Amino acid sequence: MSVLSLRLPPLLLAVAALTVAVFGPSPARADRYDDAVAHAGRPGGDLKRDKIDHPAEVLRLSGIGPSMVVADFLAADGYYSELVSYLVGPKGHVYLLNNEAYDKWSENQWQGRVERLPNVAHETVPVEHLGLPARSLDAMLLIKVYHDLYWHPDEGPWPKDIDADAVLTEIARVVKPGGVLLLVDHSAKPGTGSADAGTLHRIDEQYARRDFENHGFELVGSSDVLRRPDDPRELITYKGEMVGKTDRFVMVFRRQR
């Protein structure tokens, strides 16, 4: 079960507390997030990933729902894009955004999803110039990719000169005031900032929080559903013994008006 923290007005907190005190906790029941995960026809590889990533709990924090316009930033094969497509429904729209590097790393596996999902559009764009209208998004997802903005490799397809400040400024431009940003990433040790982004592919949680707050976003919620206290936060995330076993932070921000 996720440990969820949301900022609610005092009156709503009082009502919630009274409800639990009088009636007890509500029995678990399926909602649109569970329904999205249970949707027929999802690829087998996605179902295996569900056991590690707990997508219903993560997406529930975002509040994404029918008719919304959502971007999945550096979506790779589009695992989350497909789930969001079910949440927003036929009147909503999902942008599956990759740059050339993420298209290459995903081996273009997003193509099958786009063919099946009429409300999902794939775009290959530079991360500093997303090509979307200003204030056009109800929500944006950054799932285990934010740390890459601070990675400056000497070789490979990832751009060597990405300006993280410019990318976050662009993200703030396209998310409408009041819109939501859902952030998930691999935890680095506290106080390390972005130092481990290029080596371990991790980033410090509080550094991430300050980064988004400095670009016009307010933290409004968090979840411990992907926490792994046994992770020493000293090993690389995408290969070796830590694959699927990393401590990950989950935060949701709201674009300030």
Describe the residue ranges of each PLM region.
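A short glycine-rich, Lys/Arg-flanked "PGG" loop and its adjoining helix->strand segment in the class I
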Residues: 85-86, 158-177
